[in-house]
């Protein structure tokens, strides 16, 4: 006697039921994501390439100094010289939207979990499973619900990027010194003031690590999502793989490295700048 456990036997009816009863909700989610993603991509592609390079370099100079400005300019010029400018901008837009939503979901839950041990205990096995599941698996339900295109890629990337950000947010707020919080209560500070003036600045170093992990995992997922029609550099990697064109795959891979370095440095700079300003105030 053999046992055949097939998740598809019950998963397919569930997906059909969701598509039938929540089609309007999924269509609205798709429309919102497409609008935000399309607007950001259009904003990146509207000015000439040299203008984007100058803006990124100026922003990096203001946040981190001249070394970061040179790094940002070199990374973007490298993408342009590889003849992958449009694809690089599309990938930056995909990752930016995905990371922004992942952070918006993970940070509040992480703060709440740091204050509620039972919630943290309940979330721990869920996060363990989410971080153990191969990234390809996230694309399957997303494609089944949202069909092919950029939207399922964004949804899968958001889900894939939430666990590291949530874990490190919880850790960051648990590591805040209790005497600082007690001092805030002693001087009569409101809970909101304690959160934004004491806890958040103290948690910034660990939050930077979480954001870095979220960006890198999101970038990896966006590249894999080229298989489902997400576009960007992931589509070029997929094209190089299917056609056995090593040059195309290598060019796209190098552009991905440049984009990853750019996003990592800029995100770190923004958070660290906020940390310094909060400490001064």
Predicted regions and their residues:
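Transmembrane alpha-helical segments of polytopic membrane transport and secretion proteins
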Residues: 1-5, 12, 27, 265-281
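Interfacial loop/helix-cap signal at membrane boundaries in integral membrane proteins
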Residues: 1-48
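Transmembrane-helix boundary motif in ABC transporter permease subunits
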Residues: 56-63, 75-86, 99-127
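Membrane-spanning helices that line or support transport/gating and their immediate boundary helices
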Residues: 87-91, 111, 121-125, 168-175, ...
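Generic hydrophobic transmembrane alpha-helix motif, especially the helices
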Residues: 94-97, 102-107, 111-114, 124-161
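Glycine-rich helix-loop "coupling/hinge" segments at transmembrane-helix boundaries
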Residues: 144, 218-259, 271-281
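Transmembrane alpha-helices
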Residues: 155, 159, 191-225, 247, ...
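Short cytoplasmic-facing helical segments at TM-TM junctions of multi-pass membrane proteins
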Residues: 164-213, 237
């Amino acid at each position: 006697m053999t046992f055949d456990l097939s998740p598809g036997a019950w998963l397919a009816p569930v997906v059909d039921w969701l598509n039938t009863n929540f089609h309007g909700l999924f269509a609205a989610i798709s429309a919102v994501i497409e609008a935000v993603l399309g607007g950001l991509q259009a904003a990146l592609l509207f000015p000439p390439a040299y203008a984007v390079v100058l803006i990124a370099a100026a922003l990096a100079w203001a946040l981190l100094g001249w070394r970061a400005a040179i790094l940002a300019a070199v990374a973007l010029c490298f993408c342009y010289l590889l003849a992958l400018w449009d694809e690089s901008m599309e990938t930056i837009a995909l990752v930016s939207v995905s990371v922004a939503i992942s952070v918006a979901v993970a940070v509040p839950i992480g703060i709440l979990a740091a204050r509620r041990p039972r919630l943290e205990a309940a979330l721990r096995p869920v996060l363990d499973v989410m971080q153990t599941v191969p990234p390809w698996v996230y694309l399957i339900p997303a494609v089944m619900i949202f069909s092919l295109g950029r939207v399922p890629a964004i949804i899968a990337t958001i889900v894939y990027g939430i666990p590291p950000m949530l874990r490190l947010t919880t850790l960051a707020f648990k590591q805040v010194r209790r005497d600082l919080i007690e001092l805030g209560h002693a001087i009569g500070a409101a809970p909101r003031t304690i959160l934004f003036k004491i806890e958040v600045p103290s948690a910034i170093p660990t939050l930077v690590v979480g954001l870095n992990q979220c960006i890198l995992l999101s970038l990896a997922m966006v590249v894999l999502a080229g298989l489902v029609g997400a576009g960007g550099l992931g589509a070029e990697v997929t094209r190089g793989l299917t056609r056995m064109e090593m040059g195309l795959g290598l060019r796209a891979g190098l552009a991905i490295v440049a984009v990853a370095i750019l996003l990592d440095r800029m995100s770190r700079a923004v958070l660290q700048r906020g940390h310094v300003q909060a400490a001064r105030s």
